[in-house]
Swiss-Prot record:
It comes from the Bacteria. SMART domains: PGAM. This is 2,3-bisphosphoglycerate-dependent phosphoglycerate mutase. It catalyses: (2R)-2-phosphoglycerate = (2R)-3-phosphoglycerate. Belongs to the phosphoglycerate mutase family. BPG-dependent PGAM subfamily. It comes from Bartonella tribocorum (strain CIP 105476 / IBS 506).
Length: 206
């Protein structure tokens, strides 16, 4: 299976469970999060996918998700490259705060703009556009060359960083991407044509 890219949002983290804005903070996976990653690895093994290289962010929730997947696939020794370019969107001053409490303080509409607007960033944080501006060049220079050499690549990262990447891959606009939701621990498999356009997209459901 050449020219293949598998994206997966990390398994549930401790801060997902506590309903906190996480961003660049580094909480561990919950027990459920570990189980989600293990289940994803088993599902991917069933598809016949075999990875040539893996990429992940600098944050442990994504790294441990990738490790679980590779272990389940019998590829625990595979090279795994870690880069902050793949980190979650930086939520700035909201990081570590409870989402419901932030809504009470700032109002539902303001928080919705911070979370779902393509261009508006929370205080001292990143917008989704900012996130894409660091992820897309990294993808083009470091990850896409593997795919163009007919290799299969795993990226274990985060909800917003992967949404920003998917936006560029699929040619979505700012309005279209804000409606895209990524569940934890669910693999998305892209295959590509020789000219790097998408040939197929498959979501591996539990």
């Amino acid at each position: 299976m050449g020219r293949t890219l598998v994206l997966i949002r990390h398994g549930q983290s401790e801060w997902n469970l506590k309903n906190l804005f996480t961003g660049w903070k580094d909480p561990d996976l919950t027990e459920k999060g570990h189980a989600e990653a293990i289940a994803a690895g088993k599902k991917l093994k069933e598809t016949g996918v075999k990875f040539d290289i893996a990429y992940t962010s600098a944050l442990q929730r994504a790294q441990k998700t990738a490790q679980h997947i590779l272990e389940q696939m019998g590829q625990s020794d595979l090279e795994m490259i870690k880069s902050a370019a793949l980190n979650e969107r930086n939520y700035g001053d909201l990081s570590g705060l409870n989402k419901d409490e932030v809504r009470q303080q700032w109002g539902e509409e303001q928080v919705k703009m911070w979370r779902r607007s393509y261009t508006i960033a929370p205080p001292n944080g990143e917008s989704l556009r900012d996130t894409g501006a660091r992820i897309w060049p990294y993808y083009l220079y470091h990850i896409q060359p593997h795919i163009l050499r007919s290799q299969t690549v795993l990226i274990a990262a985060h909800g917003n960083s992967l949404r920003a990447l998917m936006m560029a891959l699929e040619g979505l606009n700012g309005e279209e991407i804000i409606s895209q939701e990524l569940a934890t621990g669910i693999p998305i498999i892209y295959t590509f044509n020789p000219d790097s356009t998408i040939s197929s997209k498959t979501i591996i459901t539990p």
